[in-house]
């Protein structure tokens, strides 16, 4: 019976994904999705500039089969074949755009992302990866390199490939999301195990390569209180295992995702910013030497993490979260607003209700 349910579930996810993928538009295959430079924090806690390059690829193999319930990054992928030459051209375009600024910097880092895994040969061919690594190695002021990958692609061959060219700090971002396997599978549909994650962390250590743990704050099907506890416990576990940094990702409702399906039915609400503050404070207090970050994409919007919608504290807290990421000073998170009482009441009512609640405004209608 369980197998029948699982098969039907996967088929539903795949059809939902395919329906939205038909809306993708053909874009220039020789230009990246985006490229920008910003202030960032290095692994040694110093502040510098990072160049972020988001490559356009054919997308995450796992997402094509249905994928994670909150994700629609596959929509940024190309509906057409992307070759190694295309990816090399995208990288060169990004470097050329910022080469003059890079020359003037004492040091800088480069972050190279895709809509999936940089270490998946189907998405980024080895030829393109090696070209990128070789070109990066030519910068005397390069301090760090960051890429992303699912853990199943982190192996001896790929790590040797990296170290063949790069002797700087390297981090591989892994979407661990939660260290609770039941939550990761049923509420996220991640398709990876704790065993795979631990193996990737240990393997990377052998090459002095860090693992940056992406942790999702408030996946589907759990309450606000459960989300707070899960994020704190997951971060503590990742730090215990030796992850080089923790990057919290407050859930944002992506168009075309399963999360949006429940959001539209008012059966899901993105996390409160008060919850995020509590998570960051607790994790940093317990692990003062750990590097803790928080993504603020979507923060303050209706589809992103927010307190009372349109409350003035949303903008303030977003700024404080960004400052915390750069300074690692939990004192900047000391914020107060009357709407905090609504958050406390929401958690209390939701716990009595047992099942997760939706938007508090719609609940009062």
Curated annotation (Swiss-Prot):
Keywords: 4Fe-4S, Iron, Iron-sulfur, Metal-binding, S-adenosyl-L-methionine. GO terms for cellular component: cytoplasm. [4Fe-4S] cluster binds at residues 60, 68, 71. CDD domains: Radical_SAM. PROSITE patterns: RADICAL_SAM. SMART domains: Elp3. Pfam families: Radical_SAM. Residues 45-289 form the Radical SAM core domain. SUPFAM superfamilies: Radical SAM enzymes. GO terms for biological process: tRNA wobble base 5-methoxycarbonylmethyl-2-thiouridinylation. One of its GO terms (molecular function) is catalytic activity. Signal peptide: none annotated. Its cofactor is [4Fe-4S] cluster. NCBIfam families: archaeosine biosynthesis radical SAM protein RaSEA (TIGR01210). This is Uncharacterized protein MJ0550. It comes from Methanocaldococcus jannaschii (strain ATCC 43067 / DSM 2661 / JAL-1 / JCM 10045 / NBRC 100440) (Methanococcus jannaschii). The lineage of its organism: Archaea, Methanobacteriati, Methanobacteriota, Methanomada group, Methanococci.
């Amino acid at each position: 019976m369980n197998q029948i349910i699982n098969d039907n579930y996967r088929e539903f996810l795949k059809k939902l994904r395919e329906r939205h993928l038909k809306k993708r538009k053909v874009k220039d295959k020789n230009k990246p999705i985006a490229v920008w430079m910003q202030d960032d924090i290095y692994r040694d806690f110093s502040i510098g500039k990072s160049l972020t390059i988001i490559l356009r690829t054919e997308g995450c193999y796992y997402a094509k089969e249905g994928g994670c319930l909150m994700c629609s990054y596959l929509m940024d992928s190309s509906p057409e074949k992307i070759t190694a030459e295309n990816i090399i051209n995208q990288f060169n375009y990004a470097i050329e755009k910022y080469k003059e600024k890079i020359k003037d910097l004492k040091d800088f880092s480069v972050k190279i992302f895709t809509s999936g895994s940089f270490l998946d040969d189907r998405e980024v061919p080895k030829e393109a990866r090696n070209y990128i690594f070789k070109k990066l190695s030519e910068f005397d002021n390069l301090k760090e390199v960051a890429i992303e990958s699912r853990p199943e692609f982190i192996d001896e061959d790929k790590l040797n490939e990296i170290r063949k060219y790069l002797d700087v700090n390297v981090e591989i971002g892994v979407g661990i999301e939660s260290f609770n396997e039941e939550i990761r599978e049923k509420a996220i549909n991640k398709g990876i195990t704790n065993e795979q994650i631990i193996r990737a962390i240990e393997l990377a250590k052998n090459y002095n390569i860090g693992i940056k743990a992406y942790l999702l704050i408030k996946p589907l099907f759990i309450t606000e209180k459960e989300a707070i506890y899960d994020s704190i416990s997951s971060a503590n576990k990742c730090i215990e295992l030796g992850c080089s940094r923790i990057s919290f990702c407050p859930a944002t409702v992506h168009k075309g995702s399963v999360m949006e399906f429940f959001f539209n039915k008012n059966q899901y609400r993105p996390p409160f910013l008060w919850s995020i503050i509590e998570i960051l404070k607790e994790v940093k207090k317990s692990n003062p030497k750990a590097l803790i970050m928080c993504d603020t994409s979507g923060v303050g919007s209706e589809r992103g993490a927010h307190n009372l919608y349109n409350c003035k504290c949303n903008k303030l807290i977003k700024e404080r979260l960004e400052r915390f990421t750069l300074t690692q000073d939990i004192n900047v998170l000391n914020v107060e607003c009357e709407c905090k009482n609504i958050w406390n009441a929401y958690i209390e009512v939701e716990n009595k209700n047992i099942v997760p609640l939706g938007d508090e405004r719609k609940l009062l209608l």
